[in-house]
Amino acid sequence: MKLNQFGAAIGLLATGALLSGCGSDNNAAVGSARTGPSSGQVSCGGKPTLKASGSTAQANAMTRFVNAFERSCPGQTLNYTANGSGAGVSEFNGNQTDFGGSDSPLSRKEYAAAEQRCGSQAWNLPVVFGPIAITYNVNGLSSLNLDGPTTAKIFNGSIASWNDPAIQALNTGVALPAEPIHVVFRNDESGTTDNFQRYLDVASNGEWGKGIGKTFKGGVGEGAKGNDGTSAAVKSTEGSITYNEWSFASARKLNTAKIATSADPEPIAISVDSVGKTISGATIIGEGNDLVLDTVSFYKPAQPGSYPIVLATYEIVCSKYPDAQVGRAVKAFLQSTIGGGQNGLGDNGYVPIPDSFKSRLSTAANAIA
């Protein structure tokens, strides 16, 4: 097994976009799984060593997935480079890897390139679900409440001090310091950034105003590469704030903000339960086995107790690979990921695939050739 981050070995290491290459007018709830083969079946064989790259958000999960693959299929493994969603898509489309990991589904332009690379339809298969944490480092501040509008104004520079009245109003009775806010953002193309900016765009009641995309558009702060880089920067910088995939926040023991939503003015902390409530309401907008999720409901949840900043990481695969041996191995990897690879994900800051969705996902994985 070889797991890389920015080209180096890693030890510690999960959407929504509205745009998909293949849209469907027939939305299906995540819970309305179609009948499919058992998620416990793994058909081993094919290419001995797969190569993949992309999302840093799923890097910790990939450790478990590769271990599950190796246990299920002795003699087979996967080398994964966690170099960001943008790189994962471009390397897959450039035929440098066997599949890519992305925290956003393929855009129409990316989908066209993927279809050319595959010689068949490309599919977006969400196998990792995880919250994006807003992490901060302020001396003496162990608890922080935020909401969409206030968070947006912090990350576009409209709020520049920790004792700003808007932050104080959400943290009654808390002594906030009169010190500047140091924003840290991802300086690589990032699906985490894309999802975070989509949250700000949807949940800020117009306060964001900077647009969306894989490149940070806030116009304020200092950049760092990957979830690892941003979490390390906040850990070492007094007065700083950033957005991280939860497993990195947990690994570095960073303070995380609670988030108030339109469904629940009581600020909600990240937990497996609060994120599970959020993803239970997601619908599939992709067509057939292209399982793109419509996650606008994540950002403005209807159910109280839902944590709103959640991403799904997609494995970008060919429905039919030019090399059947690659297709067979990718199928086996995904089968083991959907099965035994889900065990213990909660310990790493992820939410396991809901049982009601496993059948739908297994149907897609088993159709890969």
Swiss-Prot record:
Q: Give the principal location in a single coarse category.
A: membrane
> InterPro entries per the record?
ABC_phos-bd_PstS, PBP_domain, Phosphate-bind_PstS
A single GO cellular-component term from the record reads: ATP-binding cassette (ABC) transporter complex
Question: Could you confirm whether the keyword Lipoprotein appears in this record?
Answer: yes
Which residues are noted in the entry as phosphate-binding? Answer: 55-57, 85, 103, 190-192
Q: Which UniProt keywords apply?
A: Cell membrane, Lipoprotein, Membrane, Palmitate, Phosphate transport, Signal, Transport
**Superkingdom of origin:** Bacteria
Its membrane topology, per UniProt? Answer: Lipid-anchor
Name the Gene Ontology biological process terms.
phosphate ion transmembrane transport
Per the record, the coiled-coil ranges are: none
Q: Where in the cell is it found?
A: Cell membrane
Q: GO: which molecular function terms?
A: phosphate ion binding
Known NCBIfam families for this protein? 3a0107s03
> What family does this chain come from, according to its entry?
Belongs to the PstS family.
How would you summarize the oligomeric state and partners of this protein? The complex is composed of two ATP-binding proteins (PstB), two transmembrane proteins (PstC and PstA) and a solute-binding protein (PstS).
Protein name, per record: Phosphate-binding protein PstS 3
Gene that produces this protein? pstS2
